[in-house]
Amino acid sequence: MASKKIRTRFAPSPTGYMHVGNLRTALYAYLIAKHEAGDFILRIEDTDQERLVDGAVDIIYNTLKLTGLNHDEGPDVGGEVGPYVQSERKAIYLEYAKNLVEKGEAYYCFCSKDRLDMLKENAEALKRPFKYDKHCLHLTKEEIEANLAKGLPYVIRQNNPTTGSTTFDDVIYGKITVDNSELEDMILIKSDGLPTYNFANVVDDHLMGITHVVRGNEYLSSSPKYNRLYEAFGWDVPIYVHCPPIMKDTHHKLSKRNGDASFEDLIQKGYLKEAVLNYIALLGWNPGTNEEIFSLEELTEKFDFKDISKSPAIFDDAKLKWMNGEYIRKLSLDEFHELAVPEYKKVLKKDFDLKFISDLLHTRCELLSDLADQIDFLEELPEYSTDLYVHKKMKSTVESSLENLEKVLPIIEEIDETNWNKDYIHEKVFELIKSLEIKNGQMLWPIRTALSGKSFTPGGAFELAILLGKEESISRLKKGIELLK
C-alpha cells in the first residue's frame, strides 16, 4: 500500500511582524513536506478579529516569497480544499460544533461575563487555575431551546471527562499522559460565531488532509484536548512535531513584545535572508555533522524532523553575525558591491572609488549595516584622541608617531599626482622606513591613524591614501602632527 502523501501547513495569525519563532515553524513545516515531495499549505488564522493588524497578511506573503518557502496551496494561489482564510470558513466550524453537541462531546454555554468573572475570582482566591464548572452541561433540551429562541448569547464548549487520563504521542517529546481532571472545557465556538484557534485548527487540519502538525511546545498541554476532538469525530490524529522554544538567554524566551528582532528587523539590520534562514534552521535541529552552512535545497535534502531537539535553543546574535559573514564572503564582488552601495551612500557624499572600497571590505564584512560606520571617516575626519597612536604590537607611541609623521610628510608631499598609486607610495614610504631603521608598524600605524582617526579601517595606510587622494591625505597628516605636538 502506498504511503499517504505528506501535507504540512503554516497557519500564522496576521497580528504583526513575522517573529523568528514563526519563521522557524514555517521553515520546518516546509522542510518536512518537501523532504518527501509533499505539499506545503498556507492558511491564514484570523479568528481573533481584535488582534488583526492591517498589512500583516502582506508581511506573511512577502516573507515566504523572500525566503523561498513557496506554498503549494493558500489564499493567494488557491487549491482544492479552500477557502484558506479561517474567517471565510465560519459556517463550516459551526456545523461541526453542532455535530459534537449532538454526540454529547460539546454543549451550549449561556453563562454571563459576570458569572465567569466570579468563578475566576473564586479560583484566584483559592490559588487554583480557573476551570469552568460545567454549569450549562446540565441544562435540559427545553432550557437550551428556550435560551436560543430568546437570542441569548452563547458559546459552545468541549465536554471533557473529569476522571481517567488521556495519552498522546509526540515525535520529539515521546508519549505524554495527562490527567483528564486537568482538562478544561475549552470554548469551541465564541459568542461572535467564530471558532476559537484551537477548534478551527483541528477541523481545518482534518479537512485539508494535514499529516504533520508543526508548532511550538507551548501547545503540548493543549494536545489532549485536540485529540479528544479527533476521536469524537472519528478522525485520524496527525503526527505532532512540537518544537523547543527559542530563548533570548537561559531565562527569557525570544519575544517581539520584549523588543526582540523579527525577521524584518534582521533584514533591515543588514542580515542576508539566506543566512537568517540557515541560522533559524539550526535553532533546535542538528544535521548530525559539524556542517553549519546549508542552502534551502541542502536543508530540504538533509532535514529529518526526528532530529529536532527537546532542549530550548538560544538565539545567539554573535553566531548569526558570524554566519552572515560567511554568506557575504560567498557572494561575488559584484553581488556584494550592489548590496553595499546603498550603505556607503548613507555617509559618503564626495566622489570616492566605491568599487575599491567594496574590494577592501568584502572579506571583512559581517553585517551590511556596519559598513557606514566603517567608512564614514572618508567623508570627514572625526575628532580622535592621541591614545589611538599608541599600539603595543606595532611598537608605536605618541612620541614615535609624531617623529615619524614629521619625517614622512615631506616624502608624501613630493609624490607627483601622476604617481599617486599604491605601489609608488609603498615604495617611497618603505625607503624611508629602511633608512630610519624602524619597524614597519612604527610608521604605518601612525599614518593610518592620522588618515582615519579610527582604530579599525577597511584598508591599510596606502589604501586609505589612495581613497582620500593626495591633497586630503597631506591635510590629515598635518592635522595628526598638530594633534600630537
Swiss-Prot record:
Binds 1 zinc ion per subunit. A motif ('HIGH' region) lies at residues 12-22. InterPro entries: aa-tRNA-synth_I_cd-bd (IPR045462), aa-tRNA-synth_I_codon-bd_sub2 (IPR020751), aa-tRNA-synth_I_CS (IPR001412), aa_tRNA-synth_I_cd-bd_sf (IPR008925), Glu-tRNA-ligase_bac/mito (IPR004527), Glu/Gln-tRNA-synth (IPR000924), Glu/Gln-tRNA-synth_Ib_cat-dom (IPR020058), GluQ/Sye (IPR049940). Keywords: Aminoacyl-tRNA synthetase, ATP-binding, Cytoplasm, Ligase, Metal-binding, Nucleotide-binding, Protein biosynthesis, Zinc. It catalyses: tRNA(Glu) + L-glutamate + ATP = L-glutamyl-tRNA(Glu) + AMP + diphosphate. Gene3D superfamilies: 1.10.10.350, HUPs. Its cofactor is Zn(2+). GO terms for cellular component: cytoplasm. Its EC number is 6.1.1.17. Zn(2+) binds at residues 109, 111, 136, 138. PROSITE patterns: AA_TRNA_LIGASE_I (PS00178). The keyword Nucleus does not apply. NCBIfam families: gltX_bact. Monomer. Catalyzes the attachment of glutamate to tRNA(Glu) in a two-step reaction: glutamate is first activated by ATP to form Glu-AMP and then transferred to the acceptor end of tRNA(Glu). Belongs to the class-I aminoacyl-tRNA synthetase family. Glutamate--tRNA ligase type 1 subfamily. This is Glutamate--tRNA ligase. It comes from Clostridium botulinum (strain Eklund 17B / Type B). The lineage of its organism: Bacteria, Bacillati, Bacillota, Clostridia, Eubacteriales. The gene is gltX.
